[in-house]
Amino acid sequence: MFSCQSLYKFSHSFRKRIPVMFQRAQQKSSLLHTQNESSHQPSLNKLGGFSSASLNFNSSRSSTNDDQQTFSSQSDNLPSSPITLPAKRGRSAASLKQLDNTVGFDVSKPSLPVFENSGLGSKYSTEIANGVYIDENDFDDDLLLENDIDQKPIPWSSSPIEHTKLTKSMLSSEKRSKNHLSKIYEDHTSEKGASSVISSNITRQGIKRSRTLPWAVDPYRYGDPDPKRTSTSADISQHTVSNDSSNKLSNGRSSSLDSLAKKRMSKSKSTPQISKKFSVPLNSASKSPIGSSLFKTSDSRKKSVPSIFLSDEQKRILDMVVEQQHSIFFTGSAGTGKSVLLRKIIEVLKSKYRKQSDRVAVTASTGLAACNIGGVTLHSFAGVGLARESVDLLVSKIKKNKKCVNRWLRTRVLIIDEVSMVDAELMDKLEEVARVIRKDSKPFGGIQLVLTGDFFQLPPVPENGKESKFCFESQTWKSALDFTIGLTHVFRQKDEEFVKMLNELRLGKLSDESVRKFKVLNRTIEYEDGLLPTELFPTRYEVERSNDMRMQQINQNPVTFTAIDSGTVRDKEFRDRLLQGCMAPATLVLKVNAQVMLIKNIDDQLVNGSLGKVIGFIDDETYQMEKKDAEMQGRNAFEYDSLDISPFDLPDVKQKKYKLIAMRKASSTAIKWPLVRFKLPNGGERTIVVQRETWNIELPNGEVQASRSQIPLILAYAISIHKAQGQTLDRVKVDLGRVFEKGQAYVALSRATTQEGLQVLNFSPAKVMAHPKVVQFYKQLASVNGLPIRNENKAPVQMRGVKNK
């Protein structure tokens, strides 16, 4: 009945364990016989044997209380010349060699039970005392085996997974012996999803490796049968089954999930998996276990990247750029989402040209703006330097640089941010250079333009005291652009009254009511958390002086963080020039209690412009230990204002700080990072360990000309109005007596989100200046209320011949 011809397929390590298994079986079989003599027959799942065809009795299980299995009538006969296996067998080489030559096993009595329906009679139904019993230790490593389901199953295995695999021949065999399968409708699986009896067109799915013992998964598998199960129920299959009749049992009955299995499955699905990483709650509240969350910036960014949601007018512009391929200029007042929309346009265009990344050139008029969007300056892209030469000389200069020529030839879309600071002369020169280099007579050589900026903000830098012309005054503006669009919905300020005041300030036409309201904002604002408003100055000198003065007032040791600069540009002087506009400084000096500003988005709560205070410097190991200790004690990690011990600290706080100091000393060689407590817009707090981030100056082909790795923090006591352009600040202090340029007052005051967070000193309507040409240019946009204005001087898009390949 059982043959061992396929024993050679076993692994060497598995064969070594077989003698031990039989030795253990001999010792336990007598005890098993004594215990079960007056009760039901033991489960066939506890018995072992060899079959050259299959173990189809292992693929399902009876629901009756005796938990018996029925053999197929197609089973092989017993071996004609069995050999006797000694009760005690060593692991000698001779013994293994004898085992390899074995064609069957005989233990003096029938080693396997034969039941009534097997066709072999019932006289052996009680003679199972010497049957082979498989101990749970034999299952230790079998579940790690991975076998192909399409291959013929091995004759016998201690792994329950092997008993579930049926081939086409097994199914046909079961169909011919249908009368013997009336009690075998349940499969031989656990609740984690093993295999039902399925058809030959089964789709193989990788077996999940596990060391879990089968009876630890299903208590009814190797003991008494589950009384809740019926003969028509079957566990859900782990394999993928087609939608046809392949999910039917071979006897024609449908495989269904019984109520207990459903309960188990739903429980396993609903139970959350505990992550080893620290999860960051987003509903932070002040001084609460959730509100004072602690995490590393690198972890948080992977978990929660700020999502970009576009308004209808923003979606319309995105469609005009990506789908309709129009050359456009979109603008809007401060806080209308120009930067958000531009980042989305860049993201979608790069995805569209992902196989040809150099087709999209991302540039900006200034190094700061270019660094913020991951691009390069317009001058660097064009290869024109200061562009003071004639067009012919510029073309000759560009042709000497093969990389620069290739950029011009490969570019399909040219993006220019902060175009308001590009003068008309430079724009016209670049347009002619593009036509000459690309040998294309179409405007800008057939390149699609995406321009954005606000001409009411900072104007082009005048050269040699000569006032520069605005970009919209250039000939290129009239010939190359299809549409001009103005964004109207303000996101930054929710107060309609404040929005109205800022719009009047932008146009340079303030009403008496607005003047009165701005003058009221000269009061001093006191904040309970001790964080000061950020002062905006028109010059870098004033910014450095203010920050230095504040830092000298802090009686703490300074900690210096030096940026790590790299890139394809080897000339340090040139690379430093490229990184000069980067928001991250080359050298950052911090102290405990220093006020800082985050200059990169971390998640939906901690964004560019968030204010915080340095409460200490710790290494990553100390951070992890303190976090775990706080979780175990049910408290907030780093719930104190400083890691240094103060005479005013309570005893329990001192004890925690002493422990922290000990941990820091134990890892004194590790790098210490700033530990910063940030203030959230909703009034809550978040304490994070801030580590290095990277800013790239990147060419369209992906080449990183310059890169800076630095802590994403700056001192927040003061920043320049120029660097504040594009920022959103909750607390702002501005002295308008210092402004000297048109648009500076508007840029500075429009950084604030509310009137409550804005302090204005020396306000005077005379300081509110808007250029008459800019006012006239925007009158057209105001008249159409955000609708696109077509450039009638521009040729239709299809005539430009810019098509996707």
Swiss-Prot record:
Report the superkingdom from the record. Answer: Eukaryota
For bias type Low complexity, the affected ranges are 245-257
Q: Where is the composition biased (Polar residues)?
A: 66-83, 230-244, 268-282
Return the SMART domains for the record.
AAA
Q: What is the effect of changing residue 458 to S?
A: In pfh1-R20; cold sensitive for growth, suppresses a temperature-sensitive allele of cdc24
Q: Name one GO molecular function term.
A: single-stranded DNA binding
Report which reactions are catalysed by this protein: Couples ATP hydrolysis with the unwinding of duplex DNA at the replication fork by translocating in the 5'-3' direction. This creates two antiparallel DNA single strands (ssDNA). The leading ssDNA polymer is the template for DNA polymerase III holoenzyme which synthesizes a continuous strand; ATP + H2O = ADP + phosphate + H(+)
Q: What class of enzyme is it?
A: isomerase
Q: Which GO terms describe its cellular component?
A: chromatin; chromosome, telomeric repeat region; mitochondrial chromosome; mitochondrion; nuclear replication fork; nuclear replisome; nucleolus; nucleus
What's this protein's name? ATP-dependent DNA helicase pfh1
